[in-house]
């Protein structure tokens, strides 16, 4: 089985994250993610995490506070009091944020967005072992070519070259999550070539193999590229401007049981998707399309943390998709960090 494992590199304490989470809630995520939309080369020291998530704020001593005095050597040692367990600041969402998210799609269900968005997530991210599995049901999906981004096509707007397909987009998301201290597995094996039909069934088997080998996995993220055409059949780009840069639009897709297949946790998946989209709306208003609620399952019944994201469309460039992927990865990292370890694994 071919896959890419992103080793977990925790770079901050829970106490630090609590402080930063409160700052993010107070000031909004938008300023914190400004750096996520550029296409500058990755730093030579990838172990250095993104500042907005992992910067450690050390407490300062008041100017007139005397320095701590050393203990006299003849005083008996006293057992220190046990330190209190750090408490992470919970992510909070408002009714207005629920109203700002439009749900579309073929599904006839009308879920209560406010109730789902504002209730605590049941997702619990473990500290040990891979927590997120990134997959690509349609692994050969690619983007409109531009100078410097040419690739050999396996079919129209498809390629087996991982550097130019949605697998490259998955790499970007995996890097962001790993830098945030979230352990990731990235499945990069071809899944829709040479036969496009049956891709979801093949991916279901792959997901179940991963879940059996890595029971710590809590979220399965299926990364796609959407297809959009004009009346003449030409690819259409779906773009949003974020901090002066063109980004591919994002669409979160959530499956249900309306098609008749068993899917008991679809509302939990939807609740998590709403939270991620609310964080994206804070960071980059206008980047997300309507949340797509569907009658199909899309293999999301495998875990209550499943999510499908469409990063751009066939008319977008890879550069636009990578900018969007970085913003998505940052928002997803904030959400997942909020579900870490205080609930157990």
List each language-model region with its residue ranges:
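Alpha-helical scaffolding within the catalytic cores
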Residues: 205-207, 232-240, 291-297
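Solvent-exposed loop/turn segments at secondary-structure junctions
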Residues: 139-142, 190-194, 225-230, 257-260, ...
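N-terminal catalytic or cofactor-binding beta/alpha core of small enzyme domains
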Residues: 10-218, 227-233, 326, 336-344
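Active-site-adjacent substrate-binding region
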Residues: 265-292
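A short, glycine/acidic-enriched catalytic loop
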Residues: 152-156, 228-264
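Extracytoplasmic/secreted envelope proteins and their assembly/folding machinery
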Residues: 170-174, 204-208, 270-273, 277, ...
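Active-site-adjacent mobile loop/cap segments within catalytic or ligand-binding domains
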Residues: 286-345
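Structural recognition of the beta-strand scaffold that forms the well-ordered cores
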Residues: 133-136, 184-186, 219-222, 251-254, ...
């Amino acid at each position: 089985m071919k896959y890419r494992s992103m080793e977990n590199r925790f770079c901050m304490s829970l106490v630090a994250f609590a402080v930063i989470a409160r700052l993010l809630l107070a000031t909004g995520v938008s300023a914190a993610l400004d750096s996520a939309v550029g296409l500058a080369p990755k730093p030579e020291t990838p172990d250095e995490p993104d500042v907005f998530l992992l910067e450690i704020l050390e407490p300062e001593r008041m100017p007139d506070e005397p320095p701590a005095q050393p203990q006299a050597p003849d005083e008996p040692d006293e057992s220190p009091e046990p330190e209190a367990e750090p408490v992470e600041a919970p992510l909070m969402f408002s009714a207005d944020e629920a109203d700002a998210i439009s749900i579309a799609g073929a599904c006839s269900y009308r879920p209560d967005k406010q109730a789902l968005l504002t209730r605590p997530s049941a997702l619990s991210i473990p500290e040990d072992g891979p927590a997120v599995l990134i997959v690509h049901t349609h692994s050969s999906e690619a983007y409109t070519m531009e100078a410097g981004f040419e690739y050999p096509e396996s079919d129209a707007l498809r390629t087996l070259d991982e550097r130019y397909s949605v697998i490259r987009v998955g790499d970007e998301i995996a890097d962001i999550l790993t830098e945030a201290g979230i352990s990731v597995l990235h499945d990069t094996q071809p899944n829709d070539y040479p036969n496009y039909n049956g891709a979801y069934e093949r991916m279901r088997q792959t997901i179940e193999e991963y879940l059996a080998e890595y029971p710590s996995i809590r979220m399965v993220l299926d990364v796609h590229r959407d297809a959009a055409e004009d009346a003449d059949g030409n690819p259409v780009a779906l773009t949003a401007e974020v901090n002066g840069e063109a980004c591919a639009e994002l669409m979160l897709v959530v499956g249900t049981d309306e098609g008749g297949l068993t899917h008991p946790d679809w509302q939990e998946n939807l609740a998590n998707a709403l939270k991620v989209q609310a964080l994206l709306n804070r960071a980059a208003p206008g980047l997300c399309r309507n949340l797509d609620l569907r009658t199909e399952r899309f293999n999301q019944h495998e875990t209550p943390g499943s999510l499908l994201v469409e990063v751009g469309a066939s008319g977008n460039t890879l550069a636009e998709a990578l900018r969007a992927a970085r913003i998505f990865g940052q928002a997803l990292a904030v959400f997942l960090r909020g579900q870490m370890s205080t609930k157990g694994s």
